[in-house]
Amino acid sequence: MTSADIRDVFELPPPEIGNKQKSKTPTERRPEGISRELYSLLGENSAPLAIYQKKFKEKPKVSHKAKNWVRQPFSISSRKDDFTLHHWVLKSEVDSEASYKFEKFNVPLFIIDYTDEEYQNYLKDEDWNKDETDYLFRLCKDYDLRFFVIADRYDNEKYKKHRTLEDLKDRFYSVSRKILLARNPINSMTAAQSSLLNTMEYNKEQEVIRKKYLIGLASRTPEEVAEEEALFIELKRIETSQAKLLSDRDEVLRLLDEQKGDGGIHEYHTSAGMSSLIQDMINSQRTKNKVEEAIVSSSAPSSGVSSVLNTPTRPHALSTPRIRYGPQPTDPQFGITWHEKLHPGTFVRSQKIPAIKASLSQRVSSVMTELGVSSRLIMPTAKNFEKFVELQNSIVSLLELKRKVDRLSQETEIQDKLSRKRSASPDGSESKKHISQ
């Protein structure tokens, strides 16, 4: 069976008779500079490097129409000659009478002028004559008070005097200030004139010293800079240690000044009690003087007060070599702390707050409320806990001191009343009767 028989069975149309053209696959053009054999070896793989082909720059595709520009001449109004410049502007914006748009930035400075009469009355100076002063003011107008340019252009040979930048500034501002004060007294000046007068302040000596100081700073060597930084750090350390030492000293003196007697005022009524009080005061003053001398003669700022108290003062203490102590591991900056007692298990730091007497707890809470401090720590860190305990102890000490003062004042008041009654009755019969009742 042939293919024609099969087509007859399935009633298929006969095949079209004609030459079919094969579809040609598009071939890429071989680039210049590569041989045909080498290019055929590449196959479908592209070249590893882009091949540069010389061609002209493509013309930009602009969708809108090009704008027309015109080269227009313009003049500067601040110039008195006929000097003309040109610039490019849009043809639609061409205006022969329009001013130059950057002309608004050409603002001349206000420089005071003076007359011959004003110079003779107010501006005479032994070191400056009128011609040189006029020359200085002309340069200031020409160079808009740019004193570095003025000092560079200044003709020192003409007047046979070497003028520094500070000399030129001092002469200009002193003349301007004198003229302004002569024309407008201070009492009748406006706000603008007062502001202008304040801007004319110039201290020549201060500027000279400042520039010398800056020159000295700029001429330092790296070794000198490092030494100054080390000295500054050492100064900060000494100031910190000195502040801590003074606070410890005040605390020790406060402890030494505390009264030792708790028996009330009755123990000082007799001569023996008064003698004991005077002796205690003398001993307290001697102890205070010894502590101050020991602290002053101490050579180590970071040694603390305890070492000062434990070390006796000797006459040859100043001749002993000074010992310089370095940083200790227990300094706060290293973050190392030593706990006095470790509690077993987990505990809250607020549990370590010392308990207050029941008679004082309510008063302590009221004082802390007046100070705006909560009686319960919100964030009980180590520093907050320490400050809170310190505040609580200070309040307790204050309340105890107030109680003693009130008690002493009451006893004093009673003694005053008794003394007045005794003085009222010579024999003291009324006072004895009053006491017996």
UniProtKB/Swiss-Prot annotation:
Primary subcellular site in the record, as a coarse category:
nucleus
The UniProt entry's GO biological process terms, in alphabetical order, are: DNA repair; negative regulation of transcription by RNA polymerase II; transcription initiation-coupled chromatin remodeling
A Pfam family it matches: SANT_DAMP1_like
Transmembrane intervals:
none
Record bears the keyword Transmembrane helix: no
Q: Where is this region: Disordered?
A: 1-33, 302-328, 408-437
Tell me which Gene3D superfamilies the record gives.
Homeodomain-like
Q: Which UniProt keywords apply?
A: Activator, Chromatin regulator, DNA damage, DNA repair, Nucleus, Transcription, Transcription regulation
Tell me a Gene Ontology molecular-function term this record carries. transcription corepressor activity
Q: Name one GO cellular component term.
A: Swr1 complex
Q: Which InterPro entries match?
A: DAMP1_SANT-like, SANT/Myb, Swc4/Dmap1
Q: Where in the cell is it found?
A: Nucleus
Q: Where is the SANT domain?
A: 125-176
Task: Enumerate composition-biased segments (Basic and acidic residues).
Answer: 1-10, 408-418
Highest rank taxon of the organism: Eukaryota
Q: What does this protein do?
A: Component of the SWR1 complex which mediates the ATP-dependent exchange of histone H2A for the H2A variant HZT1 leading to transcriptional regulation of selected genes by chromatin remodeling. Component of the NuA4 histone acetyltransferase complex which is involved in transcriptional activation of selected genes principally by acetylation of nucleosomal histone H4 and H2A. The NuA4 complex is also involved in DNA repair.
- Subunit architecture: Component of the SWR1 chromatin-remodeling complex and of the NuA4 histone acetyltransferase complex.
- Identify its protein family: Belongs to the SWC4 family.
Would you tell me the protein name for this molecule? SWR1-complex protein 4
Which species is the source of this protein? Schizosaccharomyces pombe (strain 972 / ATCC 24843)
